[in-house]
Amino acid sequence: MIKKHYYSWQDIETMCISIVNQMYTDNWRPDYIVGLTRGGNIPATIISNMTGIRCEALKVSLRDDEMGPESNCWMAEDAFGYNKEPTNILIVDDINDTGATFNWIMKDWQSSCLPDDDKWQSVWNNNVRFATLTDNLASEFTEHCAYTCHEINKSEEDVWLVYPWENVGQYG
């Protein structure tokens, strides 16, 4: 039987404070924050409100949406520094589960803006960083999350995490 862990709204606020503190400890500040729909939007907005940094949304739904993910070329150009200096971007999701979402972003952004340029190797974990409330150590995301609050290892323990925005009734 799968073990379930329920996060409270207080847990989420505490984790967002932790991410902000980790950024300040690193002396790193994003120019903007990208919240991934659906799970990353809420923590990204909370972090945005705590820091006064603007927040954007990016739809990367690899399993729940027939339309699939959207590509935001302007974010890739900002990350790369296509027309100016590279922009610091914090990409936020609730969980790095399999790693597919973050890997898709890296592949999509690089393929949309000078894909063969070696400069991309210095983009990731420098001016573009990933943050999650929970990081699955068994994920296939090889770059690692710069900022995280809880670590799990789903290859050792099968756990289902329930965030407060997922624990509401369905209407209609």
What does each model-identified segment do?
Residues C16, G40-A44, S48, F102:
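Short, highly selective alpha-helical patches that border small-molecule cofactor pockets
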Residues N21, T45, N49, K107-S111:
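Short, well-ordered alpha-helices that flank and scaffold nucleotide-derived cofactor binding pockets
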Residues N49-L90, D97-D108, K119-S122:
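Short, glycine/charge-rich flexible loops or terminal/linker lids adjacent to PRPP-binding catalytic cores
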Residues Y32, E56, L90, R129-T132:
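A structural signal for isolated positions on well-ordered beta-strands in alpha/beta enzyme cores
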Residues W28-T37:
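Short glycine-rich phosphate-binding loop at a beta-alpha junction
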Residues M1-R29, D65:
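Active-site-facing substrate-recognition patch
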Residues I2-H5, D26, K107-G172:
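PRPP-dependent phosphoribosyltransferase catalytic core
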